[in-house]
């Protein structure tokens, strides 16, 4: 069983690495980070779809069955995701592209998935955490691509930022709090699984503070720009009346 899991994770790692190499060849005029973020975007979309299917259709429901035995589909998705996180953590460390908080998030994610696979249980809530964590990931990558291509300061960029902040606050913080509560009050999950849940939620709050600061600064900047435009419009209108008279 352990050998089969290791082979699945190894195949996943090789798959993500192969996809990254393919993107690098297809985008030779772009940076390595461009190709890595394409891999991240692909994983985000794929993991959202798979984890949503597991949580909402295949089951079990994470809010009522935390700590339940892993299903075969949960195991496959966790192995697929574990291979990705190992790839991305290695890339981030090699290129030194991320700070300590993101590295801590990736490390906790890897440890949490390994823990669920080794125990053979708690895949239900780990899958739910995967869904909540990855739900905003495609938006984050879209924001980066918009900035790189010079289209960030546009209506599309504003929509992406709004959806990112709203989903992160509502799902990762709001729904995440409900999931953590269900995890803590349930007698089924192991104590160290609960501790891992607390650690992941604490990391989410660290991200949330940074996101709120960004949203506040952007809102103030947008407000001042709007005030400036209004002032210019009133001045032009006033000057026009003076010329007529």
From Swiss-Prot:
Protease keyword on record: no
Keywords carried by this UniProt record: Membrane, Transmembrane, Transmembrane helix
Entry's family note: Belongs to the TLCD5 family.
SMART domains, sorted: TLC (SM00724)
Gene Ontology CC annotations of this record: membrane
Compartments in which it is found: Membrane
PANTHER family registered for this protein in UniProt: TLC DOMAIN-CONTAINING PROTEIN 5, TRANSMEMBRANE PROTEIN 136
InterPro entries xref list: TLC-dom, TLCD5
TLC domain residues: 29-204
Membrane-spanning ranges: 1-21, 38-58, 75-95, 99-119, 162-182, 191-211
Name of the molecule in the record: TLC domain-containing protein 5
Keyword Transmembrane helix: yes
Entry membrane topology: Multi-pass membrane protein
């Amino acid at each position: 069983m352990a050998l089969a899991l290791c082979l699945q994770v190894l195949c996943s790692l090789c798959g993500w690495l192969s996809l990254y190499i393919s993107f690098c060849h297809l985008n030779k005029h772009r940076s390595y980070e461009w190709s890595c973020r394409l891999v991240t975007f692909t994983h985000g979309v794929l993991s959202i779809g798979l984890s949503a299917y597991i949580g909402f259709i295949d089951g079990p429901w994470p809010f009522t069955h935390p700590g339940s035995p892993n299903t075969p589909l949960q195991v496959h998705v966790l192995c697929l995701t574990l291979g990705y996180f190992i790839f991305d953590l290695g890339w981030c460390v090699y290129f030194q592209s991320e700070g300590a908080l993101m590295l801590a998030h990736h490390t906790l994610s890897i440890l949490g998935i390994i823990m669920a696979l080794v125990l053979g249980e708690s895949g239900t809530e780990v899958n739910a955490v995967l869904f909540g964590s990855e739900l905003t990931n495609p938006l984050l990558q879209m924001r980066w691509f918009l900035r790189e291509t010079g289209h960030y300061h546009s209506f599309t960029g504003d929509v992406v930022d709004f959806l990112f902040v709203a989903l992160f606050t509502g799902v990762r913080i709001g729904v995440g709090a409900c999931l953590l509560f269900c995890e803590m009050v349930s007698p089924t999950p192991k104590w160290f699984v609960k501790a891992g849940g607390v650690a992941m939620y604490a990391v989410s709050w660290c991200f949330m503070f940074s996101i709120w600061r960004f949203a506040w600064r952007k809102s103030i900047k947008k407000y001042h720009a709007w005030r400036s435009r209004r002032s210019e419009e009133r001045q032009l209108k006033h000057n026009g009346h003076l010329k007529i008279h």
